[in-house]
């Protein structure tokens, strides 16, 4: 079904809005993928906060033109699914995990702001921890010394209480 001019403008505006907030875009060829598998991919993308759509390449070229992702225009050839995310790693992870499970699904390219990645670059990006994982590790690292200090401070009154209990037990036994 072809789109009329107003519908095309609406799609370009919607994709432009997503691209403006994006930290990563991943392109993948979906030729030969069954509908049920694509539905699972869409559900996984939604859960990870990834905007995932099959769009006409010309419309996406217009949406990314003049942005930090304009270098991707040369890679927009063939039937592609576009994964756009605010987390630099989320789109790469979702699409790469799906590509591992489905041989017909092929990662073509990706981009971070100002940098175009090939398929290997997207795969290596997918192995990085997500922003939430990195923040959790940082928080754990920051809390560890404080928690150890609190345990050390708590040990002094605990030892004193144990000493008093031992003296009390000795006096009661005698």
Curated annotation (Swiss-Prot):
<dbReference type="GO" id="GO:0006412">
    <property type="term" value="P:translation"/>
</dbReference>
<protein>
    <recommendedName>
        <fullName>Large ribosomal subunit protein uL10</fullName>
    </recommendedName>
</protein>
<dbReference type="InterPro" id="IPR001790">
    <property type="entry name" value="Ribosomal_uL10"/>
</dbReference>
<keyword id="KW-0699">rRNA-binding</keyword>
<dbReference type="InterPro" id="IPR043141">
    <property type="entry name" value="Ribosomal_uL10-like_sf"/>
</dbReference>
<keyword id="KW-0687">Ribonucleoprotein</keyword>
<dbReference type="GO" id="GO:0005840">
    <property type="term" value="C:ribosome"/>
</dbReference>
<keyword id="KW-0689">Ribosomal protein</keyword>
<dbReference type="GO" id="GO:1990904">
    <property type="term" value="C:ribonucleoprotein complex"/>
</dbReference>
<dbReference type="InterPro" id="IPR022973">
    <property type="entry name" value="Ribosomal_uL10_bac"/>
</dbReference>
<comment type="function">
    <text>Forms part of the ribosomal stalk, playing a central role in the interaction of the ribosome with GTP-bound translation factors.</text>
</comment>
<comment type="similarity">
    <text>Belongs to the universal ribosomal protein uL10 family.</text>
</comment>
<dbReference type="Pfam" id="PF00466">
    <property type="entry name" value="Ribosomal_L10"/>
</dbReference>
<keyword id="KW-0694">RNA-binding</keyword>
<dbReference type="InterPro" id="IPR047865">
    <property type="entry name" value="Ribosomal_uL10_bac_type"/>
</dbReference>
<comment type="subunit">
    <text>Part of the ribosomal stalk of the 50S ribosomal subunit. The N-terminus interacts with L11 and the large rRNA to form the base of the stalk. The C-terminus forms an elongated spine to which L12 dimers bind in a sequential fashion forming a multimeric L10(L12)X complex.</text>
</comment>
<dbReference type="GO" id="GO:0070180">
    <property type="term" value="F:large ribosomal subunit rRNA binding"/>
</dbReference>
């Amino acid at each position: 079904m072809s789109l009329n001019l107003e519908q095309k403008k609406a799609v370009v505006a919607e994709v432009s809005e997503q691209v403006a907030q994006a930290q990563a875009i991943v392109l993948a060829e979906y030729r030969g993928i069954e509908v049920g598998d694509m539905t699972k991919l869409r559900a996984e993308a939604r859960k990870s906060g990834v905007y995932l759509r099959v769009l006409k390449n010309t419309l996406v070229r217009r949406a990314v033109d003049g942005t930090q992702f304009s270098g991707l225009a040369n890679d927009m050839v063939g039937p592609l699914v576009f994964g756009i995310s605010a987390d630099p790693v989320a789109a790469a992870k979702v699409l790469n995990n799906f590509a591992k499970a489905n041989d017909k699904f092929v990662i073509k390219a990706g981009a971070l702001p100002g940098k175009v990645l090939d398929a290997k670059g997207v795969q290596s990006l997918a192995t990085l921890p997500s922003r939430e994982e990195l923040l959790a590790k940082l928080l754990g690292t920051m809390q560890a010394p404080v928690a150890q200090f609190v345990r050390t401070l708590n040990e002094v009154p605990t030892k004193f209480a144990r000493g008093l209990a031992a003296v009390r037990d000795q006096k009661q036994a005698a």
